[in-house]
C-alpha cells in the first residue's frame, strides 16, 4: 500500500500531492494549486515527472483522481487555474490533454452553513474570485 503526501514548493501558498494505491497502480490527489508561479515552477514539472514515471505516451493523460480546492485565496487557486487553462487550450487546439482531473471537490462548507462572516469578507474583496 502506497501513501505519501508531497508538499510542492508553493512559497506562501499550498500545493500538495497525495499519492496512494499500490506500486503497480498508483493514484494521485491534488490539493490546492498554490499561487500563480507554482504551476510552472513546481506543479507542472512534478506532473511531467509522474507522466514519465508511469511511462505515459504523449497521447495519454496523467489521471489525477481528485482535485481539491480548499478555498479561493489566490495562494491556493492560481496555480490550479493555470493547470485547467492548459488543459482547455490543449483541447481547443485538438492536442492531447496532458493531465485529466477525474473529479473536482471544492470546500463549500461555509456556504452550506450560511456563514455570514464569510459572505461579509467576500463582499469586501477588491476583485472577484476567478472561475475554473
Stretch-by-stretch model annotation:
Residues 35-38, 72-76, 110-112:
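Solvent-exposed loop/turn segments at secondary-structure junctions
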Residues 26, 41-104:
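Active-site metal-binding motif and surrounding structural segment of the metallo-beta-lactamase
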Residues 1-63:
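Conserved beta-strand hairpin/beta-sheet module of binuclear metal-dependent hydrolase folds
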Residues 1-3, 59, 81-132:
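Flexible, acidic/histidine-containing loops and adjacent segments that form or flank the divalent-metal
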Amino acid at each position: 500500500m502506497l501513501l505519501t503526501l508531497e508538499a510542492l514548493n508553493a512559497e506562501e501558498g499550498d500545493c500538495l500531492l497525495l499519492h496512494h494505491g499500490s506500486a503497480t497502480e498508483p493514484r494521485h490527489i491534488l490539493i490546492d494549486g498554490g499561487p500563480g508561479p507554482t504551476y510552472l515552477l513546481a506543479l507542472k514539472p512534478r506532473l511531467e515527472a509522474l507522466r514519465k514515471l508511469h511511462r505515459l505516451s504523449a497521447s495519454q493523460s496523467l489521471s489525477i483522481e481528485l482535485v481539491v480546492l480548499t478555498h479561493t485565496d489566490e495562494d491556493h487557486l492560481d496555480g490550479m487555474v493555470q493547470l485547467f487553462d492548459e488543459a482547455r487550450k490543449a483541447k481547443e487546439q485538438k492536442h492531447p490533454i496532458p493531465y485529466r482531473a477525474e473529479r473536482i471537490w471544492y470546500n463549500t462548507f461555509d456556504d452550506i452553513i450560511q456563514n455570514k462572516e464569510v459572505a461579509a469578507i467576500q463582499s469586501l474583496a477588491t476583485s472577484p474570485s476567478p472561475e475554473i
